[in-house]
């Protein structure tokens, strides 16, 4: 189960406590010890850390999977650091190839603009957008010349790019990989250079891209950013990464009843990761609930109810969560009543004239 490492010796107690919060649930924080060093250096300099998260507006709705990294960014905000949200209105025209088995359809500028507008509205359910620095990466990527791109491409080799699991699999399978997909990590990396990121947050599928950003910063004379990756949340199928294209998503702007119902239907085996990645429960309580859920049956059902209440409360408030739970329970009783009524119905006599050739004619 995810958890936080012990703070390094010599770190002031308040920074040690902050480090525990910021690393809790993370899949990796690299280089090792770098976040503690950055926290201490920022304290000495009297400035907040610049913590970057990039989002490409690839669809109209954000899921609980998107919220995993958004909530980590909010933790940095709550500790006094500056959240820098990069809206990929330039990279969104290309599409992130991470985790893809084939080339994405390129979006139009109008599609990207509309998706970006709805994204910002939904991001406000998690981040304090007014306190964040919101940037659009066309600001620095659109003016680049072909010569600029050539100089940038010199920092990465094709061999480096083929180390990526998704590219390697596609290459081995003979699936086409466009050159623009190879350039995508460089574009994302330039975002880090442009805003001088101290830390970048992303899912584990972004690990390669985040390290490219770190390398490009150093090539431009900047300190390389700390890379903090979060686990990918599996969807309602309990197998694949949560994604609209796989129809396994739970969306931030869904009605409370829909969120509650979907959470009650997730497979038992993903309950633990949902508790860790979608709630703000204390880690000790999460471990206790995960252990309870491992027993299955009624125990797992009770944990799901707690999970659903917590998540709906986060995005809609406690009253909406109580109403959603009541509506769910009423639906369960209604379905149970329908089954009982059918079982207790009197037998129906079928006349012999309605039976012929092994069939009943109605």
Residue ranges and their predicted role:
Residues 26, 105-229, 238:
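Divalent-metal (Mg2+/Mn2+/Ca2+)-assisted nucleotide/phosphate chemistry catalytic cores
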Residues 74-127:
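Well-ordered mid-protein domain cores that form the structural environment of catalytic cofactors
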Residues 2-50:
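Positively charged, low-complexity intrinsically disordered leader regions
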Residues 59-60, 92-94, 142-144, 234-237:
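Flexible loop/turn segments at secondary-structure boundaries
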Residues 88-92, 189-192, 280:
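Short connector loops/turns at beta-strand edges and beta->alpha or beta->beta junctions
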Residues 216-362:
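Conserved nucleotide- and phosphate/pyrophosphate-binding catalytic cores
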Residues 32-97, 199-207, 213:
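N-terminal catalytic cores of NTP/NDP-binding nucleotidyl/phosphoryl-transfer enzymes
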Residues 46-55, 83, 184-194, 235, ...:
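Short, hydrophobic/aliphatic alpha-helical segments
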